[in-house]
């Protein structure tokens, strides 16, 4: 986990960081609607898992926006070189297990590690918590394919010093002009603002529209 400490005294967000860090609930969230038609068609043609594809797309976008690589360690802001994935997987008994997947520069390379990681996670009991699933250099992902939600909240321990973004995808919905999917984005306000979430959402949509 390679990271660099940010110089708080010279950081333009110094006041913002200190202001929001004092709050009991420093996270804020928005829900956006993603156009999924091109990604769906591409995955169908290539034989790819759509869910793995949009999880990768979100991670690619997050790594492009520096503030999504910011974390708080020992009360201080740092920036990681690379951010990975920690997602939930549904098990046969309808419970879920945490699954770590390392990011890669291209989708095929990502799949080579993600697929065996997912298989190994499903074989674990309970929540499947490991050192990797607790990594701070990751984004927490969840998928609710049954619900076309318009907003979403997360279970959280306020005493735990969490600063990882949380991204959730919903139900794929067919409409007259194509397919859409809700995506909820929750981030730590001490590390970023709505502008940065907007950058992320645009880059995510751009990736989904690539093919």
Residue ranges and their predicted role:
Residues 3-6, 32, 42-46, 61:
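Aromatic-residue-lined binding/catalytic grooves and analogous aromatic/hydrophobic interfacial grooves
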Residues 1-31, 51, 129, 136-180:
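Flexible, Gly/Pro-enriched loop and linker segments at secondary-structure and domain junctions
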Residues 41, 52, 56-64, 112, ...:
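A broad, structural surface signal
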Residues 46-47, 192:
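Short alpha-helix boundary/capping segments
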Residues 108, 120, 161-211:
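Active-site-proximal acidic secondary-structure segment that organizes catalysis
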Residues 91-149:
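Helical lid/core segments from catalytic subdomains that handle acyl or acyl-like groups
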């Amino acid at each position: 986990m390679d990271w660099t400490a940010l110089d708080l005294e010279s950081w333009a967000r110094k006041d913002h960081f200190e202001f929001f860090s004092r709050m009991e609930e420093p996270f804020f969230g928005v829900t956006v609607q993603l156009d999924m038609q091109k990604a769906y068609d591409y995955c169908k043609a290539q034989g790819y898992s759509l869910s793995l594809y949009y999880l990768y797309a979100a991670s690619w976008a997050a790594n492009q926006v520096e503030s999504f690589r910011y974390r708080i360690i020992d009360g201080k802001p740092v920036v990681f070189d690379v951010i990975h994935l920690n997602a939930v997987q549904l098990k046969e008994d309808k419970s879920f297990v945490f699954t770590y997947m390392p990011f890669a520069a291209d989708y095929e390379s990502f799949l080579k590690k993600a697929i065996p990681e997912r298989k190994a996670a499903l074989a674990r009991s309970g929540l499947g918590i490991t050192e990797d699933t607790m990594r701070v250099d990751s984004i927490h992902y969840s998928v609710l394919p049954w619900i076309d939600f318009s907003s979403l909240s997360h279970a959280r321990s306020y005493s735990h010093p969490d600063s990882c973004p949380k991204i959730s995808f919903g139900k794929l919905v067919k409409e007259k002009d194509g397919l859409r999917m809700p995506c909820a984005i929750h981030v730590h306000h001490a590390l970023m603002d709505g502008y940065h979430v907007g950058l992320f959402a645009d880059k995510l949509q751009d990736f989904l529209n690539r093919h």
